[in-house]
Amino acid sequence: MEPHLKIDVSSASGSTTTGATASTSEAPQDSQAQQTMPPPSSDWSNQFNSPEAVSPKANGIKCFSPYSQEDMGPFVEQLLPFVRASAYNWFHLQAAKRRHFKEFDKKMCASEENAKLAELQNDRDELKVKWASRLLGKIKKDIQNDDKEAFISAINGSEPNKCIISVADQKGKMRRIDCLRQADKVWRLDLVTIILFKGIPLESTDGERLERSEACVHPLCINPFHMAISVRGLDVFMANYLKDVDTKITLTYPRNDELSDTVMVKQEPGEQTIVAPHAVLGTSSTHTRVWETNSERNAETIIITYDPQKACHTYFGGRATLAQQSLSAGNTYMVNKTAVDNNFFNAKRSVLCLPPPPIQNCFPYPIAGTSDSQQMDMSEDSNDGPSEKRSRDISSHDSPNSSTNDEVRRIVESGTEKLVLGSSIWAAPGQFSRTQQNQGAPGTSRQVRPLPDFQSQDSARSPGAFRSTAKPVCRMTVNTGNHGDVGVVVVDERNREHVIHAQHIVNALSSLRTTPSMRESPVGRKRMHPHTSNSFEFLNCNQEMNKNEGALGSDISPTHTAVSNLISRESSGYMASPTKFTTARGDTTSFSKIFQKIEEKHLQHNQPSTSYCNSQIQPPILSSKPVDSSVKLIAPVAVKPIMSGCNSIIPSPITTPRITPSFRMLEDDSLINVLGQLAHSNDGTTLNDSFIQHLIDTNSRSPLLSSGNAFSALSMGAVSGLVPGNSIHRPDSSASNGSNSLGVAMGLAVPQNIALAVQQTQNAMSPLHQIRVSVGAPPACSPSSSNSSLGAANQAPVSNTPQDPNAPKLPTDFSHALRNEKK
């Protein structure tokens, strides 16, 4: 590699060094060559024709390049004059804020922020240019090779409308870079270019506020002139307020001659103790104030003026005095008068103390959505919003095309016809915008077309007066009360030369839906027209009828009273069908609908209710009979006997043994012994009538009778055929005598047999009902007594059986057998 020449600026002799490392033997010769080389002349210029980077030194030597050898190149050289000085202040100020928050765990106060900003503005130019060159080198690496020359052409203004595509990251999105060495913050590449070349202070999270123009079609474009910042209407108004020359603030104070070199300056303006020839004031870095005084030293009063335009320029591109906070007063600064010269308004200071960039070729760029169809000038500092608003972050700022920004644009526009705050932005019909006046375009005119009143027109008009305003067959949406809207076809034969074809009416009536559709919202708030495209179409007309009728006329939604007179004429609601008619209320119904509603009411009336919404409503009584044939299981009637179910001769239907009985063989007379023991029980109670009636009911679904075991097995001589077995005692019985349950012996231990079918009469129940249990009678437990009881049961008289085999059998009378047993 060919060695390059380096110049040591700090050395007065202007000695040079070679880029390549020489050997030890050639070191003396190199030192002699360096001593004999003369310094460059004062008119020596850069071979790349770059502008002056720094001011001349005391020895008259101009610096070749303020940055290192590896950063030098035509890309950086050509873009460096266009870098804004405010970019250096902004990036370093944001980094200082983050360091302060990490170190002290609190944000910077206003005084510290202003002091840091003043320090950054008074940094050496070499540091600023070196920082800008390094940042441009990073940007060069992230731009595609084919677009590097296009980026230079876009920045210098020769081709600002071309997209510059950057290199995407791993996810295919905009790449982020750090703008400082060892910085803890990364910035989007498009944000960096806007801050560098347009001087707009943006946060690292302001990427959502970027708006791209219509010409920018690539999402990775970093051309700063293709992007603008969407702002609120208040921001645009404040920018216009600061640009106005009439907004200077003038304050008059008595002169303080005690201070010769320094003056006391209050941080907050507006108080009577402010005395300053020139100072930078403000509550924050974004609201820097520049105060200037009159130059007359011997004047009795000091006039302090505040120019917002110079204040903003001081922050964005100028310099401020290096102020030191006073120890005596915390809210004041000690300002040195020798630094006042650094605060004069100079446009060159907006670009890193370098010559200003050449005048760019401004070209009109059409943007859709701008006020009064004006064309926006795409210049270097254009901050106008684009045509399309992104959907993200809509809640944080208004759209550029909103009414608020439209009014602000009118205020911002320069000219003599500037509007006053609070005045209307609407112009009279005879006036038009200033842009149209300048371009010579005709102004907009307001056209007012009065609506004709057909009721007040003269009746002696021509017969074809209404031909263009009405159709022969008109569709209307009718308000039918609480049942929704109904489409109606109205035939108008007035002033018609030709008779309406009957087929049109037939098609309209056949396709008309006369059944009102129920809607979710009340009819009074919703009027549905037939031409609306939704799933609830009230009028179904075929396509042929729509073609024949044409596009003239419109659908009407009349009031309910007018429709009642239209549909129901003298209560004769004939709607082209003999089965459909219109009620007095205006509802269209039919006989089938009425019959269907009546049937639904009967079904609802017969259907039992099982929900207990109110405690006062008595629940329905459960019946032992099935309500419907489809019901397979019905709960039995809960009977409340006088005695407990465990001690009763016949257990309760809801009593269920907790232990499954074992099926054992019973002896011949074991069942009769059980009956005898229960008959001679010491309880001495009488069975209830309802209990016995439930027992002999054939339709009863009690567990005792559903098992197939009945008293007919005992009365018809089937005792000998019973399966012998022992009775099972319930372990959980609460009876004092430990009596057995008859349901266990008869309902579970007896094989299935024909169920008992008896008549539900009082005479049939009287013998069994009159059974009395004697107190203290010894139970018959001997075999002889059991045999005698069995014989008495077999010899008991049986009632005459009816000749009809299907007739119900009479109950067996056991009274004689029991009397013989007692004897």
From Swiss-Prot:
GO terms for biological process: determination of adult lifespan; DNA replication; positive regulation of transcription by RNA polymerase II; regulation of egg-laying behavior; regulation of locomotion; regulation of nematode pharyngeal pumping; regulation of transcription by RNA polymerase II. InterPro entries: CTF/NFI, CTF/NFI_DNA-bd-dom, CTF/NFI_DNA-bd_N, MAD_homology1_Dwarfin-type. Residues 10-25, 777-794 have a biased composition (Low complexity). Residues 386-396 have a biased composition (Basic and acidic residues). Residues 61-253 bind DNA. The keyword Secreted does not apply. Disruption phenotype: Defects in locomotion, pharyngeal pumping rate, egg-laying, and reduced life-span. Expressed in muscles, neurons and intestinal cells. Residues 1-56, 364-408, 433-468, 777-823 are annotated as: Disordered. Keywords: Activator, DNA replication, DNA-binding, Nucleus, Transcription, Transcription regulation. Residues 26-52, 433-447 have a biased composition (Polar residues). The keyword Phosphoprotein does not apply. One of its GO terms (cellular component) is nucleus. One of its GO terms (molecular function) is RNA polymerase II transcription regulatory region sequence-specific DNA binding. It is found in: Nucleus. It comes from the Eukaryota. Belongs to the CTF/NF-I family. PANTHER family: NUCLEAR FACTOR I, NUCLEAR FACTOR I, ISOFORM B. Probable transcription factor which recognizes and binds the palindromic sequence 5'-TTGGCANNNTGCCAA-3' present in promoters. Plays a role in locomotion, pharyngeal pumping, egg-laying, and life span. This is Nuclear factor I family protein. It comes from Caenorhabditis elegans.
